[in-house]
Amino acid sequence: PELVEMKAQVYKDPRPKEHFDRFHERTRTKGADWMYEVVRMVLTPILFVIFRARCIASDNVPQEGPVIIAPNHFSFMDHFFVAVFVRRRVHFMAKSQLFTRPIQFIYTHGGVFPVRRGHDDQEAFITAHTVLAKGGTIVMYCEGGRSRSGDLAPKPKRGIGKLALESGATIVPVAIYGSAKVRNWKRLQFPKVTVQYGEALRYEQVPDPDKGQQQEVANEIFGEIKRLYAGLEEHGRRGMAQKVRAAR
C-alpha cells in the first residue's frame, strides 16, 4: 500500500536556545523517572499486538556502561519499537518542535531531550555526553529526521559519528523494518515491525574529531544498519532470526 503523506515539516525552530535549557538541565541531573515505566506499560500491548513487534538479538545491547543505540528512522513510533526490547531505561534525542505544553511533561520525565532543529545545537551533545558519562544509554538516529519516502536515506548525518568518537561509548546499530507503514494506521493498516540489534561497535575516543572523521564513522555505522535492513528485506524476520542463531 502507498504511504500516507507526512505532514509538512518545520525545519527550523524559531524559539531561542534558552527556552530549552530547563529540559536539558532535567535530563542531565535527573533523567527518566516513573513516567518512563507508565509509557512503557501503556504502549507495550499496542506494539506487540497491533504492530506485532518482535526483536532479533536484543542481547547485543550491553546491560551496563555507556551505550549509543543507532537505528534508522521511519516513524514517530521508532523510539518505542527500539526501547521496548531493551531492559535498560534509554534516553532519546527528539526534534525540539515536540516540546510544547502539555505533552512536554511526558517527554521530559520519560527520558526525552530536545535537539533544536535547524541549529547547530551543542546543548544536545552536552546532554548526551552527560548521560553517557553516567553509564547511560542514548538513542540517536543516524539519518537525523524521519524518512519521508519510506526508504533509507542515501547517507547518514555526521552527528552520530561525532558522538561516537567524542564519547568512546559502545555503539549498537539497529535496523527497524516495517515501521515506514506505521503512518498508515488511519487507514487501519498496521504493519508487522521487526527490530534487529546488530553487533556492538567500538571506536577509540577522539576528543575533537574533524568533520571527515565524524562522517567516516557515521558511514560505517549506517553501513551496518543497511546490511541488517537488507537482510530483513531479503530473508524476513524468521530467516534472519535463524541466521543469527546459527552464527552463535
In which residue ranges do the predicted regions lie?
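Non-catalytic C-terminal accessory region of glycerolipid acyltransferases
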Residues: P1-M35, E123-R248
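A transmembrane-helix-recognition feature enriched in membrane-embedded lipid enzymes
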Residues: K7-Q63, R88, R101-G110
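Short amphipathic alpha-helical segments and helix-helix/interface helices
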Residues: L43, V82, Q104, A128, ...
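Catalytic core of membrane glycerolipid acyltransferases/transacylases, capturing the structured
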Residues: F48, Q63-D120, T127
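A generic local structural motif
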Residues: A53-S58, M77-H79, F99, F125-T127, ...
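Conserved beta-strand scaffold positions in the cores of enzyme catalytic domains, especially
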Residues: C55, F92, V112-P114, I171, ...
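Conserved beta-strand termini and adjacent loop/short-helix elements that scaffold enzyme active sites
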Residues: I56-S58, K95, V115-R117, G198, ...
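Residue-level "edge-of-site" marker
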Residues: D59, D120, Y177
